[in-house]
Amino acid sequence: MTLNVEVCWISNEKERGLKALKDFVPEEEIFIEDPIVSCQFLYNRQYFPGCSYCMKSLEEPENMLQRLSGCSEVPNLPFIYDYKEKYPQGDVYTNENGLEVYCSQECKDKAYKEFQNLLDVDGRDPEHPLLKLEELWKSFHYPPESATPILIARIIAIIRNKLDQGVSAEEAMAPFLSFKNDKKNQEIGIIQKFLDEKFETRIKEVHQLIVDALYDPRIPELFTMSTFQVLLCTICLNAQGIGTSNFENYSRFIRNLPDSSIKETALDYLDQFNDGIEEESGMFTHLEGSGLYALHKHINHSCEPNAQIRFPFNNNKVQVIALKPIKKGEEITISYIDLDDDCDCDECEEYEEFEEAGCSSSNANNEEEAREEEGEGEEIPGEDRRSYLREYYLFECHCSKCQREIEEYNKTHKKN
């Protein structure tokens, strides 16, 4: 596949970024990418059945809508049979203990080849380190969730399997240590911001359980506290929030119906469930997790982004879409935070609903909490926005919007 972007040096401040190799028009796909590793959040998987590998939402659309809206009966969704014919769920596969579910034999095979062969546990043994790890994590990291320790377990398992294939330790670890993560980012403080203050007192317990479950004497450096903190910071600062929903996929199918009158009637029918969903489920409407992406990781932030992240395939494959015209040679940028875009197209409305579910970025939940605490309105004031980026992403934003705001402030200040 020919790439439409290239990784290149942007500046000493930004370091590497992505530049367009062609012109793009609004709503044009720039690229799509599978994660190098991903995982569903722990509490979330108790309520949203999904593929343990690709995070495909496995709940039938009508059942999902009934549960999310609190309906007493299963809704009779229009064109549901046409949808299922186009997007068949297929057979579901599990591992021997039944704790992991896969949407296909292909996903199951990939999972076991990459990491699951080292992560299977006896579900009847509550003392297994990985099961204890899950319970410990859930004891202090409550919904809305922003991370999971199983992502680190999968990373370690992937590295160990690479060693078994004859790959050197340095080469096996390289993909996970190449994310932006300098010395100041490795401080425990940034981990606390993304997770919970209680985490500081539990970090040794979490680390020890991972060591107990997965230690490999061939790579002792992978199991030090220092490396553990680096991996945690990598996830906190670089992981992309993922959200999938079979009902959302069905809704997208309805919006793409060719007959406008039939489409509007179907959408009107679905609209009647909105209040029920808000009352019954609030922000918890998607299968949620996070993942690390090899190309996506190079996309820098702008408060006036020219691109946007979406998940339109009902799995963990990320899609990067142009929001405005992009010229060849121009840097591709996204917003790391919710900027309350005023675009009202169907796709952006759907994306905004997804953001409200706490899935748009690895720390979307922290952002919402911070805004509530500060009593902010719909639009983040310029200085508050920059302060948030400094605090949670450890950089000073100098995008065109920030520079404009600072210049306008300076002019006003001088006049006064």
Where are the predicted features?
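N-terminal alpha-helical interaction blocks
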Residues: 1-38
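Residue-level marker of intrinsically disordered, low-complexity segments enriched
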Residues: 3-8, 34-35, 228, 233, ...
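General secondary-structure edge motif
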Residues: 3-4, 87, 279, 379
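Pocket-edge structural micro-motifs
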Residues: 9-11, 32-34, 296, 300-303, ...
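Amphipathic alpha-helical protein-protein interaction segments
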Residues: 10-13, 17, 23, 40, ...
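C-terminal SET catalytic tail plus cysteine-rich post-SET Zn-binding segment of SAM-dependent SET-domain
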Residues: 19, 36-171, 175, 303-416
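Catalytic cores of histone-lysine modification enzymes
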Residues: 142, 146-310, 315, 349, ...
